[in-house]
Amino acid sequence: MADTGYYAGYQDDVDVDEQKRHQALYLIGIILLVTVCLTVLWVCIMLACYVPGFLKKTLEAWLNSSSLMKRRVASTLTRTPFEATGPERERNWEARRQSTTVNPASQPNTGSVF
């Protein structure tokens, strides 16, 4: 028998050790995967709880802000000239509404609902 460098009582269980190592690595991989999935789920839940509160605070702060800022945002969103936004816009609503019902052909049709 050739000297393998091990003591005489050692039994070479390379196949068994390799299978155990493979199972241990597989188990560690599953545990890490479950941990990552739970962490991602927790982050999604925290974001789902945080975002509505953030939006509420932001909108409340915006509603309490100056009317000048609201007019600028409204003119940007609606692509209306800044001068056409404001209290006189609401006062002129009836006149504008009647003019569009009298002559609807003058309004350009963009083909979209919104």
From Swiss-Prot:
<feature type="transmembrane region" description="Helical">
    <location>
        <begin position="27"/>
        <end position="47"/>
    </location>
</feature>
<keyword id="KW-0812">Transmembrane</keyword>
<keyword id="KW-1032">Host cell membrane</keyword>
<dbReference type="GO" id="GO:0020002">
    <property type="term" value="C:host cell plasma membrane"/>
</dbReference>
<keyword id="KW-0916">Viral movement protein</keyword>
<comment type="function">
    <text>May transport viral genome to neighboring plant cells directly through plasmosdesmata, without any budding. The movement protein allows efficient cell to cell propagation, by bypassing the host cell wall barrier.</text>
</comment>
<keyword id="KW-1043">Host membrane</keyword>
<feature type="compositionally biased region" description="Polar residues">
    <location>
        <begin position="98"/>
        <end position="114"/>
    </location>
</feature>
<dbReference type="GO" id="GO:0016020">
    <property type="term" value="C:membrane"/>
</dbReference>
<keyword id="KW-0813">Transport</keyword>
<comment type="similarity">
    <text>Belongs to the nanovirus movement protein family.</text>
</comment>
<keyword id="KW-1133">Transmembrane helix</keyword>
<protein>
    <recommendedName>
        <fullName>Putative movement protein</fullName>
    </recommendedName>
</protein>
<keyword id="KW-0472">Membrane</keyword>
<dbReference type="GO" id="GO:0046740">
    <property type="term" value="P:transport of virus in host, cell to cell"/>
</dbReference>
<feature type="region of interest" description="Disordered">
    <location>
        <begin position="79"/>
        <end position="114"/>
    </location>
</feature>
<feature type="compositionally biased region" description="Basic and acidic residues">
    <location>
        <begin position="86"/>
        <end position="97"/>
    </location>
</feature>
